[in-house]
Amino acid sequence: RDSSTSRGLGDVYKRQPSGCMHLVFHRGDSLNIHAKGLQPKNFIRGQFSIYGNLISKGNIDMIAIIFHPLGLKPFIQCPMSDLYNRYIDIEDLEDIELNHLKNSISSERNVQTCIQFIELFLMKRLVDIDYNHKRVQNSISQIIKQPQIEVNTLAESACLGYRQFKRIFTNHVGMSPKEYYRVVRFQRVLYLLQNNPKIEIADLTYSCGFYDPSHLVKDFREFSGCSPTQYLSSRSPYSTFFSEDCRLNVIKSHSRA
């Protein structure tokens, strides 16, 4: 859930790191990426470590599939790290079936029918997951459950050397384990602020595994563009990663894993 404001030039939507990758089909007008031009009409959004603004000047009508942290890799034949901080036009992937799906959705106005197209596409590509997938899934579960954990600990738990673990994790998730841990920690901050906007900064720091309040503010500003106090004064915090009312609900999914 991205926050939005109106500046007279269109609605402005704040984009921030979510910890997940998206497959998006615009059926209305494309959003404008601030200072970078229009989003592709149909695209994959990789893992993002940077914030930004998306500007709408027309009719928003899109279908977006938000994947769990490891969810996209079985369906797209490229290293997830190639998608890092990028919007990849579906046409550039040279994926015949995915482009056929794009064309089917663009010509079909019934949303439920489009959802059926997407489900059929995904079902056809389901494959047995490999052992590295299970290793990375376990690492993500540890990151979710433990506010403070070292990458070396994750590598040891996966029975891999540090460099090999980093390479496998990055290829599956789309960013390095250290950076992904920081994004999840940012989402944890949002979730605690969402549930208790008046939480003391010391409690927030401790609960999210930061060394001190200045460390928290530095990371929060890097991922959102402002301090927690400034954030609360301009919008309502919401974590798509941890929120119980979110259908994505990553934390419950990994609790069952």
Task: List each model region and its residues.
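Pre-recognition alpha-helix immediately N-terminal to the DNA-recognition helix
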Residues: N138-S139, R185-R188
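Residue-level signal for the short linker/turn that defines the boundary of a DNA-recognition helix
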Residues: Q148-I149, I199-E200, Y211
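Short acidic-glycine-tyrosine-enriched beta hairpin
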Residues: G37-I44
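…primarily DNA-binding HTH/wHTH and HhH modules…
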Residues: R7, Q194, D219-A257
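Glycine- and acidic-residue-biased ligand/ion/polar-headgroup-sensing regions
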Residues: P17-L31, P69
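Single conserved hydrophobic/aromatic residue that forms the stacking wall/gate
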Residues: D2-Y13
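Compact structured core domains
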Residues: I50, L54-I149, A158
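Basic/polar phosphate-binding segments, predominantly the helix-turn-helix DNA-binding elements
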Residues: N152-V183, T205-S227
